């Protein structure tokens, strides 16, 4: 077992800084719409038709600055039940002023429009859109939607932030997941200023993998729970995006709250139930826990025969299940 000091450290702002790329000023074309420097435009990007014949489209906001700079995409609701990012993007795009922007922003608050309508993580065929990238114009619905997003959004950008929440019946501490071995990505992750940033392996078919293959630094922001707005998670997301834009020299803001120190983690573990029963959790999001520290206990339905659940490592609680009814092997507490 590693000592926590080996993989958990404070991240400070005094490391060497990489110079972000700057794209020249000019019209930005998305879905055939031309957005000129100093302008903003909302458009509907046609995606696919429902069985009724109704066309479903991706809502896109393009903000094209008057000065050269990076191009940042913001995306949310790749999983249709993960809603915090929808409001994060609403707040960010409402606040941005094109005449103060260096570079441009392409924001898509709902990528999985089908899942959003059904309040579901998945597409109608039960596929996970975040396992379908980079997609194909001749593949499944998920593959076609991924291909459209890659062509119209990702391929035009220098950086990206994909906004998520925990899956249903779970909740996450605000955190950044990224490839921290890549210096450019590391610096952007640090600039975001989330309570925790995690070196996360790249999953096949994920948007982050597709962006990485194009050498685009991409962050995943995880915070809150499915089908709920969480004000703290939303505000930390908004602040983090503006900090990233300030780091990239895209946008200066004096209204940012001062970021907390970010804890960097290279290892995470889910603590799982050794038996079925009623789960009584004592550990909360953000708690710093010791190795073997009790996180709660499981009883039978009479409240008897308690079994202690302990942390397998030192670290911070970054997520936990919400359902007190557990089966053997269920995920209980996530420690980083």
Give names to the regions the model predicted:
Residues 1-336:
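Structured catalytic-domain cores with a bias toward divalent-metal coordination
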């Amino acid at each position: 077992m590693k000592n926590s000091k080996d993989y958990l450290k404070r991240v400070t702002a005094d490391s060497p800084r990489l110079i972000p790329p700057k794209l020249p000023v000019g019209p930005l074309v998305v879905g055939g719409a031309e957005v000129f420097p100093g302008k903003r435009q909302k458009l509907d990007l046609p995606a696919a038709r429902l069985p009724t014949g109704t066309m479903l489209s991706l809502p896109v906001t393009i903000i094209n600055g008057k000065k050269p700079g990076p191009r940042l995409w913001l995306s949310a609701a790749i999983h249709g039940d993960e809603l915090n990012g929808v409001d994060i993007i609403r707040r960010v795009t409402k606040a941005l002023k094109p005449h103060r922007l260096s570079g441009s922003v392409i924001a898509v608050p709902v990528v999985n429009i089908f899942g959003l309508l059904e309040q579901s993580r998945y597409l109608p065929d039960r596929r996970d859109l975040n396992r379908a990238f980079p997609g194909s114009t001749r593949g499944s619905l998920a593959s076609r939607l991924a291909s459209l997003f890659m062509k119209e959004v990702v391929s035009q950008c220098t950086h990206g932030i994909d906004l998520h929440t925990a899956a249903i019946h779970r909740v996450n501490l605000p955190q950044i997941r990224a490839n921290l071995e890549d210096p450019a990505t590391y610096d952007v992750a640090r600039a975001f200023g989330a309570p925790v940033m995690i070196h996360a392996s790249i999953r096949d078919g994920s948007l982050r993998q597709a962006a990485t293959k194009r050498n685009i630094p991409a962050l995943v922001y995880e915070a809150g729970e499915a089908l709920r707005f969480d004000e703290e998670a939303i505000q930390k997301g908004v602040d983090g995006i503006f900090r990233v834009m300030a780091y990239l020299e895209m946008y200066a803001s004096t209204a940012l709250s001062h970021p907390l120190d970010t804890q960097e983690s290279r290892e995470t573990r889910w603590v799982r139930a050794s038996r079925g029963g009623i789960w009584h959790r004592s550990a909360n999001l953000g708690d710093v826990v010791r190795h073997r520290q009790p996180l709660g206990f499981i009883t039978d339905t009479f409240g008897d025969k308690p079994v202690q659940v302990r942390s397998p490592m030192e670290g911070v609680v970054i997520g936990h299940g919400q359902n007190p009814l557990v089966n053997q092997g269920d995920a209980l507490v996530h420690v980083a």
